[in-house]
UniProtKB/Swiss-Prot annotation:
Its cofactor is Mg(2+). The record marks 17 as: Transition state stabilizer. Reversibly transfers an adenylyl group from ATP to 4'-phosphopantetheine, yielding dephospho-CoA (dPCoA) and pyrophosphate. Its EC number is 2.7.7.3. This is Phosphopantetheine adenylyltransferase. The gene is coaD. Substrate binds at residues 9, 41, 74, 88. GO terms for cellular component: cytoplasm. PANTHER family: PHOSPHOPANTETHEINE ADENYLYLTRANSFERASE (PTHR21342:SF1). The keyword Plastid does not apply. GO terms for molecular function: ATP binding; pantetheine-phosphate adenylyltransferase activity.
């Protein structure tokens, strides 16, 4: 069985992420969406919330499993799951340069593990989780940029934060 992992912080999952997951799920018999930690990011959603949201987004996809591995290296997760590939999404050349460097580190740690790069649609190439959070923070509508469960969770999170500030 061909298996791959799609690791990320997914804070929150965007339509670009979902597009890459769906494309990868057509390429591999089993795809693990892995909720991980990026120590350089400030999170809006905690690990459990990110896991629950991802599970909702992909609940109808039979060959996609969502798991959390916040304290492990990507290569270790791939080994644990017997995955032969790491899937990453690309929006632009900046992403390519970053992912090339990460793929180099992963290849050094495990020469047999491949990285598969998938491009998002041009109309989704500007979407980033950081941009989504910034837009929501200032009251913007992002419902066309994220899956429905994510849009609802963002709205609720913002409402709760606004109520706490009052």
């Amino acid at each position: 069985m061909t298996k791959a992992i799609f690791p990320g912080s997914f804070d929150p999952i965007t339509n670009g992420h979902a597009e890459v997951v769906e494309a990868a799920a057509r390429m591999f018999e089993k795809l693990y969406v892995v909720i991980m930690t990026n120590t350089s990011k400030k999170y809006l959603f905690d690990e459990k919330e990110r896991l629950d949201l991802a599970k909702k987004v992909f609940e109808n996809d039979k060959n996609i499993e969502v798991i959390a591995r916040p304290a492990e290296l990507t290569v270790e997760v791939a080994h644990e799951l017997n995955a032969g590939a790491i899937v990453r999404g690309l929006r632009n050349t900046t992403d390519f340069n970053y992912e090339r460097d990460i793929a180099g580190i992963n290849k050094t740690l495990d020469p047999k593990l491949n990285t598969v790069l998938l491009f998002t649609r041009p109309e989704d190439s500007f979407i980033s989780s950081s941009m989504i959070k910034e837009t929501v923070f200032f009251g913007g509508n992002v419902s066309t940029l994220v899956p429905k469960p994510v849009a609802a969770a963002l709205e609720e999170k913002l409402r709760n934060q606004n109520n706490e500030e009052k």
